[in-house]
Amino acid sequence: MEKIRFSNAVLALEPQMLAWRRHLHAYPERSFEEAETTAFLERELLAIGVDKIERPTKTGLVARVFGSGAGRPAVVGVRADIDALPMPEENDLPYRSTVEGVMHACGHDGHAAMLLALAKLLVNARTSFCGEARLIFQHAEELPPGGAIELLRAGAVEGVDAMLGLHLSSNFDTGVFGVKSGVLTAAVDRFNVLVRGRGGHCAFPEQCNDPVVAAAET
């Protein structure tokens, strides 16, 4: 597919991408609980017409598109995470979270929408590539050890020649991509910080070691 024609196809998909992203944003689900999210993605992928859809894990999803173009066949995987965070959304957007205490605050709704758009572009460009495009919707990225381990153990990336991960970033201007070969922000972890102090009267802060103030400064 020529570069200009592909760019025009992407721009034509913008309204649909926005609709996908806003739907996902309105109905966020926490790690390992993405049942409705995965069901929505599966319905959309079926409508798009991908060649194969698999559920290798309870809430993970893999879609495959096979190309019929000339050249050496290769299997290229693209991964997007789909889970939300356990935090409230404090705005009045028409597509704000409808789930109390849960929101897409890390862009995973956008990631999933982009991967759906890629699926549609690839289905319409089968003759432009040879081999397989494997689209992996990863559950539970936010909660270690995460859904990636489950997908790996389930064989979701077996036979993949090259793998692309993606993440939105406020470090770049709109429309700008940053690319790095190898590992980049490929781990997540949690830790607790314990602040010890000695409380006292707020009128005499100099006579106590207030743990609240210390924690706020940490």
Locations of regions flagged by a protein language model:
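Histidine/acidic-residue-rich, glycine-tolerant segments that coordinate divalent metal ions
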Residues: 62, 85-87, 91-103, 109-110, ...
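Acidic/His- and Gly-rich active-site-bordering loop/insert found
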Residues: 2-104, 109, 113-129
